């Protein structure tokens, strides 16, 4: 199956189509600049329904922060690159809380990294938006998910419109007040994917005051999807995942964090969703044909 970017720019609820494209963009953010451009051209440029697509690479070499912004006539998608090593942001200094958007505090390392590309990022968004109403979306994996969350919060706090956020393997980003204020205005359009034992989703620890934001979307040890799952069920599933991984190389918590695993899981459920939609449309078509055939004179 050839991969293409597809997106519902007007979605107001969870969408597997948008989740798939955001996962693809979060994965692509790890590539080199030239490779990103090549894939966008191949995966967007070959589609007749995608008009006037463009993109821009954002980078600060000093802070090693990267993102890219891509656009069509209808939407803009910002994807932040994650960290090559999940432990890069686990030092005590990096986990300090500092004043952030809204009334709460956020992760100092994430905030400083975002600040280093903020002017370039907002300039790209403004240029691509122009005088058109384009929906604005954010995504990222790992560190990139934290950057995307704070970026969304900053824009919302400044009164700008943002339409959705899909994150994968996201660490906790801010404190209780930040999470409360963020969720008050954006929880219903923020979808935070967690894969079973992904260790990064449990740091920085709650004991340091950190809390999660958004609406949980959970994949269990068997790859099954849960839109809602309680604490105890998640705990037992994590234990099951650990036990199942005992005699395999590597650590379950690190392996579950890999963006390639998120991509595989999201793609599988996206394809299932497409099959369900196709089956529903076919059933509707058959019903219409049946009703027409029973009408007098038809």
Regions picked out by a protein language model, each given a short descriptive name:
Residues 1-139, 143-298:
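Non-catalytic, mobile gating and regulatory segments of ester bond hydrolases
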């Amino acid at each position: 199956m050839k991969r293409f970017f597809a997106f519902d720019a007007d979605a107001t609820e969870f969408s597997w189509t948008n989740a798939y494209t955001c996962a693809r963009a979060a994965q692509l953010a790890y590539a080199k600049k030239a490779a990103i451009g090549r894939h966008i051209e191949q995966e967007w440029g070959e589609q007749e329904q995608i008009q006037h697509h463009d993109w821009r690479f954002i980078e600060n070499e000093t802070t090693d922060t990267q993102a890219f912004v891509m656009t069509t006539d209808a939407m803009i998608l910002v994807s932040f690159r994650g960290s090559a090593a999940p432990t890069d942001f686990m030092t005590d200094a990096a986990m300090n809380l500092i004043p952030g958007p809204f009334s709460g505090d956020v992760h100092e390392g994430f905030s400083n990294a975002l600040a280093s590309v903020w002017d370039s990022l907002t300039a790209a968004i403004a240029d691509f938006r122009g005088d058109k109403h384009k929906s604005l979306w954010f995504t990222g994996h790992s560190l990139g998910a934290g950057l995307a969350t704070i970026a969304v919060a900053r824009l919302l706090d400044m009164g700008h419109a943002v339409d959705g956020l899909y994150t994968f393997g996201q660490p906790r980003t801010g404190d209780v007040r930040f999470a409360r204020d963020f969720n008050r205005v954006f929880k219903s359009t923020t979808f935070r994917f967690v894969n079973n034992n992904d260790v990064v989703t449990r740091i920085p620890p709650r004991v340091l005051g950190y809390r999660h934001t958004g609406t949980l979307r959970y994949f269990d040890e068997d790859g099954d999807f849960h839109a809602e799952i309680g604490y105890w069920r998640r705990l037992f599933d994590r234990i099951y995942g650990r036990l199942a991984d005992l005699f395999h190389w590597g650590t379950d918590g690190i392996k579950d964090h890999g963006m390639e695993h998120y991509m595989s899981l999201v793609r599988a459920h996206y394809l299932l969703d497409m099959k369900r939609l196709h089956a529903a449309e076919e059933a509707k078509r058959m019903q219409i044909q049946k009703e027409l055939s029973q009408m007098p004179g038809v």
